[in-house]
Design a protein with these regions (language model features):
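Active-site neighborhood of HAD-like aspartate-dependent phosphohydrolases
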Residues: 1-62, 72
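A general structural motif
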Residues: 1-3, 57, 81, 135, ...
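A metal-dependent, Asp-based hydrolase signature
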Residues: 12, 16-32, 79-92, 110-117, ...
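Short glycine-/acidic-enriched loop or helix-start segments at secondary-structure transitions
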Residues: 17-18, 71-74, 95-96, 216-217, ...
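Active-site phosphate-binding/coordination module
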Residues: 41-124
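Conserved acidic, metal-coordinating active-site core of Asp-based
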Residues: 117-220
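Mg2+-dependent phosphoryl-transfer enzymes with acidic/Ser/Thr/Gly-rich catalytic loops
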Residues: 183-270
Length: 270
């Protein structure tokens, strides 16, 4: 029975593109995701070993804004996962299968109305792609430097009045229902893991993530850490008690894993 539940964001927290990794693709690096026949995401070999070990000592819950399909592309060390969270909390995977009852709780989300309004507002050359994620939320892939001045503020205002929120991570602008959040899904997984006997009721919760969509998850955890890069770094997100890595890129991923082991050791029974 584990004494810690660890929810960990993936992209730019645990796994990295070659550009975001920050060090050469040599023998110390391993590919963990292929896409369209080519390598897409990497981890250092040390990170893969640490994550594998961590998954044997705690209830580790991969927690991502990726869709189920996008998550399934990743060959993440530590699998198979009893629980994983995708679609920013919109799906909980139990032994790899989306839980229908959890997904049904979001059936009232009015995605078409938001898509229609967004299509009218975001119609310039700066929009490269429009995507929906598991019929729960939508996002734009944009040229960041070409986004019109005021678009983010105006769109955020429109969404906020309707129970939605807007955030930008690199080239992606997400429009997300407030009810779809990582922290809500993590709380549900925590309850289920206690119920199924894999987690002690008094267990600590640990979390790591780099984006604005991770903020609620970091705030809800007993202890949380973020890398010194990414959207939260740009926002200077530093609430009391949050640890920030000294390293950036893939080395921050290693530092986060080391930190998890440190927190587990502190809370282990004497």
């Amino acid at each position: 029975v584990s004494t810690a539940l660890i929810s960990v964001d993936l992209d730019r927290t645990m796994i990295y593109s070659s550009a975001a990794l920050g060090f050469p693709l040599d023998a110390s690096v391993t590919c963990v995701e292929m896409y369209d026949g080519g390598p897409l995401s990497y981890m250092s070999v040390r990170s893969t070993e640490l994550l594998q070990k961590l998954a044997s000592e705690a209830v580790v819950v991969p927690t991502t804004t990726r869709t189920v399909e996008q998550f399934d592309r990743i060959d993440l060390p530590g699998a198979p996962w009893r629980y994983a969270i995708t679609t920013n909390g919109g799906n909980i995977l139990v032994d790899g299968v989306p839980d229908a009852s959890w997904r049904a709780s979001f059936d009232d989300v009015d995605l078409p109305a938001v898509q229609q309004e967004l299509a009218a507002r975001a119609d310039g050359d700066w929009v490269l792609k429009r995507r929906t994620a598991d019929d729960l939320f939508c996002y734009l892939v944009v040229e960041p430097d070409a986004v019109p001045v005021g678009f983010m503020d105006d769109w955020s205002q429109w969404c906020a009045a309707r129970g939605w929120n807007v955030s930008q991570q690199g080239r992606k602008i997400y429009s997300m229902p407030d009810v779809v959040s990582k922290s809500r899904a993590v709380a549900e997984v925590h309850a289920r893991a206690v119920d199924d006997g894999s987690l002690r009721p008094e267990s600590i919760t640990l979390a790591a993530g780099d984006g604005a969509l991770d903020a609620d998850m970091l705030l809800a955890a007993d202890h949380a850490i973020r890398p010194a890069h990414g959207e939260l770094e740009a926002l200077n997100f530093r609430p009391p008690g949050l640890t920030v890595t000294t390293a950036t890129g893939g080395r921050a991923g290693e530092e986060i894993l080391d930190w998890f082991f440190g927190r587990i050791a502190e809370h282990r029974e004497p």
